[in-house]
């Protein structure tokens, strides 16, 4: 029996839609769409054209359905740490890019509230100046966070736009620097120490969860209907999941960010 899946992999410099055809114990892949990606400068900050990215997501799905009328499911992964704030279901723009230097001024202040050594003990996440924890703290200082009633990492936002269902995927959430390595949920002690509103950080969902179907409007636009699945939405996590390796084996990760 043949099964067909659509993987949408979006990096900091390009995105691609790859159809996987599983048949007779083998997997064949077919890249059906590719688009350039990159940061833009707006009002002195580096941002993502998140609406433009979403339009490319839909264009690629349409290209996939044109070639493969039946697709069993699709999912999206992207780079980590960046996110979209929402109000009443709509994005509060801009969507800042991790390369923007807005976090530099708040890093020391974050560590005054919770020293990095303690953060590392609780989360296991190495220090990077672009980690979401510093971005969110800066958004709190400027008042943007208080305007929001929801918070989604970039791939979960794109999936939400496709199917209308919000989810907070575990592997990508760990890149925020806010997830407890012990409980595998957002750490309330860190949130309280930084005065980040806990209402924005509900329970996490594990990869492999079926979110639903494409919304009727999206299905009409792309020319087909399929299940929308929550993959390991951090692109590195999805890449590692595909490596045929033993437990506790080392791997090397390098991308545009490095």
Label each region the model flagged.
Residues 1-94, 105, 121, 147, ...:
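N-terminal glycine/serine-rich phosphate-binding loop of ATP-dependent small-molecule kinases
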Residues 90-102, 174-178:
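A charged helix-plus-loop insertion that forms the helical arch/lid used to bind
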């Amino acid at each position: 029996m043949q099964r067909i899946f659509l993987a949408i992999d979006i990096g900091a410099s390009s995105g691609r839609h790859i159809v996987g055809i599983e048949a007779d114990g083998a997997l064949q892949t077919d890249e059906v769409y590719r688009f350039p990606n990159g940061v833009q400068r707006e009002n002195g900050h580096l941002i993502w054209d998140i609406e433009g990215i979403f339009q490319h997501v839909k264009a690629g799905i349409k290209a996939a359905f044109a070639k493969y009328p039946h697709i069993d499911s699709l999912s999206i992964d992207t780079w980590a740490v960046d996110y979209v704030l929402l109000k009443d279901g709509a994005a509060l723009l801009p969507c800042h890019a991790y390369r923007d230097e807005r976090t530099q001024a708040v890093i020391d202040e974050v560590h005054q509230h919770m020293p990095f050594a303690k953060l590392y003990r609780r989360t296991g996440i190495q220090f990077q100046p672009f980690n979401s924890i510093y971005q969110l703290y800066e958004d709190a200082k400027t008042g943007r966070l208080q305007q929001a009633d929801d918070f989604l990492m970039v791939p979960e936002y794109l999936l939400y736009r496709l199917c209308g269902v919000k989810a907070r995927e575990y592997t990508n959430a760990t890149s925020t620097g806010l997830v407890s390595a012990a409980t595998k949920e957002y750490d309330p002690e860190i949130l309280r120490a930084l005065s980040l509103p806990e209402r924005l950080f509900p329970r996490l969902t594990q990869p492999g969860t079926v979110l639903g179907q494409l919304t009727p409007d999206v299905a009409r636009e792309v020319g087909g209907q399929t299940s929308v699945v929550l993959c390991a939405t951090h692109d590195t996590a999805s890449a590692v999941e595909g490596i045929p390796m033993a437990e506790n084996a080392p791997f090397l990760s390098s991308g545009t960010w490095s």
